Amino acid sequence: ATWLRGNHEQDLIDALESQDGLSQHATYAQLGDSSARQWLPRLQQLPLVYRGDGWCATHAGFDAAGQPDLSIRDPFWEAYDGRFGQVVVGHTPRPQVERLGAIVLIDTGAVYGGCLSAYCPQTDAVVQVEGAATDAVLAGVGPC
């Protein structure tokens, strides 16, 4: 497994690098400044994109210029030209893993009561386990 930088990691990096530190971020402040700061070097090293043979993975998708966008929710796949091969993304929860052309959307809302999903580009296999949340608030979520 590869840990990719996503919008929450970037938000924490930005908070730790700002003059205000964690004081303006109640969620991150729970970590405690010294505890959070020890993670900063690792967070800064997280890749935005992981590239495999004929595929890549990124947290949320790509903007119109083909740059990784950590918080995009627009259907970027509608204009995707295939330049990166198959693209595996998360970020936007869906009731099930979806394949939209060369795009594979794997966020199945574990935090909202859905499954935690993993995808293998080499075999097209999907593995799912029950998420920790017990109340399925994501529309259409069923058992894994």
Language-model segment annotations:
Residues 1-20:
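Core catalytic region of metal-dependent phosphoesterases/phosphodiesterases
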Residues 14-116, 121-144:
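Acidic, His/Gly-enriched loop-helix segments that form or flank divalent-metal centers
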